[in-house]
Regions:
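Bacterial N-terminal signal peptides
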Residues: 11-22
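Hydrophobic/aromatic beta-strand elements that line small-molecule binding cavities or substrate pockets
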Residues: 86, 100-107, 120-122, 134-140, ...
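Short, low-complexity N-terminal intrinsically disordered segments enriched in polar/charged residues
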Residues: 25-68
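N-terminal secretory signal peptides that target proteins for export/translocation
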Residues: 1-8
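Short, cysteine-centered beta-strand-loop-beta hairpins and adjacent loop/turn segments enriched
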Residues: 95, 123-131
Length: 156
């Protein structure tokens, strides 16, 4: 084989390989990629739930909450929060934000799957109360619904 022919063949092969690689990398993402595990699916569900919470989407938020959930607040209080109360909070709280830093599956305990959400919550009320907290919030899920939340303050 002539050396010029060999170089031309290598160039054709390299170009065709690059085209194949390029077309493989530019294929549209599949919308219905199966979840890798139930744990991953729960984390994705939690991501969607927190997004709905921040957007004050009461319908989506309420769907994932049982009639009332026990909240162990970072300030030491233990309160029952009803779905209606949570929706009222979302509607009536003038200013709040929740900067999510991470959402991770923690494990399974007492028949519940637990997901931790780490982030910064800021709320201000018309009466002057202001909350600015870095929290780790553990959400216990059972049967596709949030049944309990435990909050811990953390340093950034």
């Amino acid at each position: 084989m002539n050396p010029n022919h060999a170089i031309a063949a290598v160039r054709i092969f390299a170009v065709s390989g690059a085209l194949v690689l390029n077309s493989a990398c530019t294929q549209p993402a599949q919308e219905e990629v199966p979840m890798t595990s139930p744990e991953h699916k729960l984390v994705v569900t939690m991501e969607l739930w927190t997004e709905a919470y921040v957007k004050r989407d009461t319908a989506t938020v309420g769907q994932a909450v049982v009639d009332s959930i026990l909240v162990h607040a970072a300030d030491g209080r233990h309160v029952w929060v009803t779905r209606q109360g949570l929706n009222q909070f979302l509607i009536e709280t003038p200013k709040f934000s929740w900067d999510i830093q991470s959402i991770d599956y923690v494990g399974h305990s007492d028949g519940k799957d637990v997901v931790v959400v780490r982030g910064r919550e800021q709320r201000s009320y018309e009466d002057g109360r202001v909350f600015d907290e870095h929290l780790a919030e553990f959400f216990a899920w059972k049967g596709g619904r949030i049944v309990e939340v435990t909050q811990y303050r953390r340093t950034p």
